[in-house]
Design a protein with these regions (language model features):
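Flexible, low-complexity linker/hinge segments
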Residues: 1-9, 142-147
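Short, flexible loop segments at the rims of nucleotide/cofactor-binding pockets, characterized by
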Residues: 2-5, 40-41, 88-90
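A short N-terminal helical cap/helix-turn-helix that marks the beginning
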Residues: 3-26, 43
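Active-site-adjacent beta-strand anchor residues
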Residues: 7, 66, 111-114
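Aromatic/hydrophobic pocket-lining residues that form π-stacking "cages" and hydrophobic walls in ligand
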Residues: 14, 76, 121
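Conserved AMP-binding/adenylate-forming core of the ANL superfamily
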Residues: 23-78, 95-100
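Structural core segment of the AMP-binding/adenylate-forming
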Residues: 54-55, 82-147
Length: 147
């Protein structure tokens, strides 16, 4: 009897589903009704993941996300964890001091920041001691990886 191999990670599951039914729906945005297929999510997370790897940060490093829920934040979270990094979604109602503690304690190397959150994150970053790079995150278009 053959033992069935199941995907062990989120990334493996997306690759598997993309290879079996690329057009199947992975995500539907309740705000925009935009649908993302398994094929699209696979292509997008591979592209984002490759850019993260090219930055030279070590796998296992923390990368924070400061964004309201959106299609882009879902794709970014999935790309981060699928590429071997630790995703740190920031609680945007926690206040600057708690965010500063979270950013410093997590040792985040980057924070992907939606425009609506930029003032809050700038305030939090100014309260902590570690160096962290901010990258723009458009809720529809995704991260600004060329910045």
């Amino acid at each position: 009897m053959t033992e069935v191999q199941f995907p062990e990670t989120i990334g493996d599951q997306i690759i598997f589903n993309s290879s079996k039914s690329a057009e199947a729906v992975w995500l539907v945005s309740p705000e925009t009704n935009q649908t993302i297929s398994f094929g699209q999510v696979h292509e997008t997370i591979m592209k984002i993941g490759q850019r993260l790897i090219e930055t030279g940060i070590e796998r296992g490093s923390s990368i924070a996300i400061a964004s309201p829920n959106s299609t882009a934040s879902c794709l970014l979270f999935t790309a981060i964890v699928s590429s071997g990094f630790v995703a740190v979604p920031l609680n945007l109602v926690a206040g600057s001091a708690i965010l500063a503690y979270t950013i410093e304690h997590s040792e985040a190397k980057f924070i992907f920041v939606a425009n609506d959150c930029r003032d809050l994150i700038n305030s939090a970053v100014s309260l902590q001691n570690s160096k962290v790079n901010l990258i723009g995150l458009d809720p529809v278009m995704g991260p600004d990886l060329d910045a």
